[in-house]
């Protein structure tokens, strides 16, 4: 019987608050390890994406970073962006890394968790349906 491969998670911290957020999310994932849950971590270098990648490699999403993400089952992505790069042509700005990842992974949107509380919970529910 073949052993099943562990799910692979690529960690791309980026810059700004990204490294802090990804580090804490990783701590949570590591704390959850046990029977029934484990993973293989794929660590990208600190300058693998965003402004740091543009500074080091001349582009916000180097091919090696995209290849790492494509080899993973999931990507934990921090953040990118640096106002010092606002003068660059659009294709070299750090934020282009997000679009490159979406395109390279066949995705169309970023998922962001939100919580709706209080009066907003029912704010978008119609009080009557059209035609009734």
Protein language model regions, located:
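Short, solvent-exposed amphipathic alpha-helical segments in soluble enzyme
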Residues: 26-29
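Anion-binding alpha/beta catalytic cores of soluble intermediary-metabolism enzymes, centered on
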Residues: 2-19, 23, 34-38, 46-132
């Amino acid at each position: 019987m073949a052993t099943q491969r562990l799910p692979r998670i690529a960690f791309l911290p980026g810059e700004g608050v990204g490294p802090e957020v990804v580090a804490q999310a990783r701590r949570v994932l590591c704390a959850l390890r046990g029977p029934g849950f484990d993973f293989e971590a794929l660590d990208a270098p600190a300058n693998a994406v965003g402004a740091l990648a543009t500074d080091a490699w001349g582009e916000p999403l180097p091919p090696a970073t995209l290849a790492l993400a494509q080899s993973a089952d999931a990507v934990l992505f921090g953040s990118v962006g640096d106002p010092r790069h606002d003068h660059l042509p659009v294709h070299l700005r750090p934020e282009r890394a997000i679009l490159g990842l979406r395109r390279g992974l066949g995705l169309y949107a970023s998922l962001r968790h939100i919580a709706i509380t209080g009066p907003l919970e029912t704010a978008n529910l119609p009080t009557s349906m059209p035609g009734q």
